[in-house]
Amino acid sequence: MQWRAFPLHPNTPEAGLLLEELFANQPVDIKKMMAHLGKTSADLGLPFGERKRTYNSRLAQELGLWAESRNAGDAFHMAAFKAYFVDGKNIAKIPVLLDLAASVNLSREEADAVLTGRAFKTAVDADWALSREAGITAVPTFVMNQDKLVGAKPYEALERLVVANGLKKRQAG
């Protein structure tokens, strides 16, 4: 599996937006949506906090690509997801991102230089362009060959995608 950056609400200001602000012009029942996400998370055994805001993930995506170049991509992404979805942290803030980098044993100083110098800006731009070209409009989206699986789906749906694209099912044990 390869992580790709995706422009999810890219115009969100650094301070974030209340979910009511984000969905102000859309027919979204935020309490119902959050209850559904909470139940789905619980059913999957995943922690999920009480989110009230959304934050701009652009810099987190840039740092995530850097973490991947340091063989710490999965650990960084998991730490960022926990910070955002469980702890409600503002992942647009550099101090938060530096803490996340340090939490997965990456150099805080190197991470600061990556963010300050925008060393992975072009790479994130390329991922965003790729998602537009592929017609991806939501996350998560899993793509194999020309097949897509969009949204939070049960494990079995992902398994069907993988098997349909020629990968053999692993045997337990």
Mark where each language-model region is.
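C-terminal cap of thioredoxin/glutaredoxin-like
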Residues: W3, L65-G173
